[in-house]
Each structure stands twice: as C-alpha cells, then as structure tokens.
Design a protein with these regions (language model features):
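Donor nucleotide-sugar binding/catalytic pocket of nucleotide-sugar-dependent glycosyltransferases
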Residues: 123-165
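Glycosyltransferase donor-sugar binding loop
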Residues: 31-37, 180, 207-221, 239-240
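Nucleotide-activated donor-binding/catalytic signature segment of Leloir-type glycosyltransferases, i.e.
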Residues: 221-241
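Short hydrophobic beta-strand element within catalytic cores of glycosyltransferases
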Residues: 278-281
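Conserved donor-binding/catalytic core segment of Leloir-type glycosyltransferases
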Residues: 169-187, 193-196, 208-214
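Aromatic "clamp/platform" in nucleotide-sugar-dependent glycosyltransferases that forms part
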Residues: 261
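A short, well-ordered alpha-helix in the C-terminal region of glycosyltransferases
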Residues: 306, 313, 320-334, 341
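Conserved acidic donor-binding segment of nucleotide-sugar-dependent glycosyltransferases
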Residues: 293, 297-304, 313-318
Length: 357
C-alpha cells in the first residue's frame, strides 16, 4: 500500500485502512509501504533512488510471504509506467508463494494503455489471472473487462466525518468558487482559469480560491496566467492547506470545481459534499456515482465551454444550489463516511461483500 507522503487519494485511503480500529482488531495485518515518490511532482518520474527503494520493497515482501501465510495480500495496483512494473512483480510474487492477491483499483487506464499493444494486453491478462479485484464503482469495471473475467467487489471510498450538520451558506455575494487539489494539469485547474476569464469578461461576479500543493503545474505559472487573463482581483492563491484550515475552505465556499480527466472517484468531492457544497465535475470514472442524479453538476465534455456553462448555471440559480446542497450532504452521510467504508472492506475480507458484480 502507498502511504503519505505524498498526499493523494490512494495514499489517504490506505492510511485510513492502516489506522482503522475495526480492520486491525478484526484481522491480523502487516503493512508494507509501496510508495517510491517523495512528493506529487515525483510521482511520474523515474530515478535511481526509486529503483533501489523498489528492490527493498520486493525483498521485504518476499520475506513476509516466506515467513507468513496470508489469506489475502492487498495491493493497490496502478496501470502505468514503473509503478505498474513494481506492482505486477509483487502480484506475481504473491502467486509464486501460493497466496491470494487482492487488487484494489483506484485509477483507470488499463484499457487505454493496452488497446494498441498486444504485449501489454497479454501481460495485463497474465497479471490479473487468479486474483480478486476491488473497484471503486461498477462504472469502472469496463476498464478491466478485456483482461479480467472474474467477479469484482465494489468498494466506494469513504472519509472521516468531521461535519455533522449542513452548514452551507447560500447567501454569499459574491459567491466563492474553490479548487482544492494538487496542481496537476489533468485535474483541470488551467481549464477553470480559462472559463473564469470568459465569465469575468461578461461581468459575472465571483471569487476563486486556489488551494493545493504544486504538481506538474507550479504557482509562479498560475500567478502569471492570472495576470494575463486579467483575474488578479478575482483569484486568491493560498497554497496547500490541511486539517482544520482545509475544512474552513469548504465551509466558506459556495461552489467546488474539479473538471478532471484524472480522477476515478475524487475524495475531495466527498469532502465538499460533507459540507453541502455544490460540486461541478466531469462525467468520468465513478464520479457520476457521487454527484449524479441532481447531487451536483456533471460536465458531459471536459471543455472550457461546458465548464463555463456549468459555473454560470450554479452562480445564477440559487434554488438549484440549495437543492444540490441538501441532496449531496444527505448522500454523503448515507454512503461515504469512513465507518461505512471500513465496514464494507471488513465484509470483503471476511468473505461477505456488500456488492459483487
């Protein structure tokens, strides 16, 4: 499992499992940190340090399986690059020792990465042989349907509940828009700035707050872009925030923006829903399971045009914002708290899963 740092959706969920009283009291667990990146910007890079660390991870895993007999070996597997090579070696190692891999897919890309490569498809199929699989949503099963024909356990993410009443303020003027995520191009921060430039030119009032750690986009670039677009008096750059400071951002926001082509589920959407903040996001991965059916606004296309329309729609429709706030808050409470997540995972590990597809 990958643990923080760096902080991203997978490492956060793995940390929840590692610290779960329910899981650790019910099962005897050993944990090995599979993370090889030092920070968000390091995730997609290869280095000598990563190779050495990977050898240590494989050696430690070898020793653990040599000296223990596990019912499941839980691996959060990634579909791309060196991360997949490392993860696939671990899967094969588990099978070599006659133990059962349990692969938890937090991202998609297996289909896209193998559609034009027979070798990759064959290797994916080989890796996914004789394993159990967990997906975040039934909507994500299609990504592996060409390489895996077995049953899939469905386990949506859940986050700790820190807000117990819907405190959404629908009387803001101007309305505060929030982006709170790592500064990664695929998460749509540049798309947001382009859409807000258009709205600003039309005289539509708003405040936009940017919160998050640098990734493949750096804050100096964001600052220059904001000046170029004439948004200096509309945009507030805050950098990364955590804990209570982060929760205050949600509490004081009117609309949350995540026009991502990157996320399969979006933990940060759950954080916004916990505060009843209406969300705008992409119609990809498992995101429709969160904010579909009137619990948010889904963009059919990840484009400046669609994002501009979605933002304008929420900015100008107070009743819609209120309805979304009520629905999203209630849906989070009913489905996505950390207690619900831990219970569902416990049921999977006990052989009594809540949902199999």
């Amino acid at each position: 499992m990958q643990f923080p740092p760096p902080i991203h959706g997978v490492s956060v969920m793995n940390d929840i499992i590692r610290n779960s009283t329910l899981i650790n009291s019910k099962f005897q667990c050993d944990y090995i940190n599979l993370a090889t990146a030092k920070n968000i910007d390091d995730l997609q890079k290869n280095s000598f340090f990563k190779y050495i660390l990977t050898l240590k991870i494989i050696s430690k895993s070898f020793y653990k399986m040599l000296t223990n007999r596990y019912e499941y070996v839980y691996i959060t597997i990634f579909p791309f690059g060196f991360s997949f090579i490392k993860d696939s070696i671990l899967v094969l190692l588990v099978r070599f020792f006659g133990q059962q891999p349990l692969l938890h897919l937090h991202t998609y890309g297996f289909r896209e990465n193998s559609i034009y490569s027979k070798f990759k498809k064959k290797y994916y199929t080989f890796v996914f042989k004789n394993v159990n699989v967990i997906c975040l949503s039934p909507l994500l099963i299609e990504d592996i349907s060409h390489i895996y024909k077995g049953q899939v356990f469905i386990l949506p993410n859940g986050i700790p509940q820190v807000n117990f009443n819907n405190t959404y303020n629908n009387e803001q003027n101007p309305i505060t828009l929030l982006y709170l995520s790592n500064l990664i191009k695929g998460k749509g921060i540049l798309l947001i700035i382009d859409a807000l430039e258009r709205l600003n030119r039309k005289g539509i009032n708003f405040i936009f707050r940017i919160v998050g750690s640098e990734g493949d986009i750096k804050y100096p670039h964001i600052t220059e872009l904001i000046k170029l677009k004439g948004l200096e008096d509309k945009v507030i750059i805050l950098g990364p925030k955590f804990g209570d400071d982060k929760y205050e951002e949600f509490k004081n926001s009117g609309i949350f923006l995540l026009p991502s082509n990157y996320d399969t589920f979006g933990l940060v959407l759950l954080e916004a829903m916990q505060y009843g903040v209406p969300c705008i996001s992409s119609n990809i991965g498992g995101i429709p399971d969160l904010i579909g059916d009137g619990r948010g606004v889904l963009m059919e296309n990840i484009s400046v045009d669609d994002l501009e329309l979605a933002i304008n729609k929420l900015l100008t429709d107070k009743l819609l914002r209120q309805n979304i706030s009520h629905k999203s808050f209630d849906y989070y409470i009913s489905n996505f708290t950390v207690n619900i997540f831990e219970s569902r995972l416990s049921n999977i590990l006990s052989g009594n899963p809540d949902l199999i597809v």
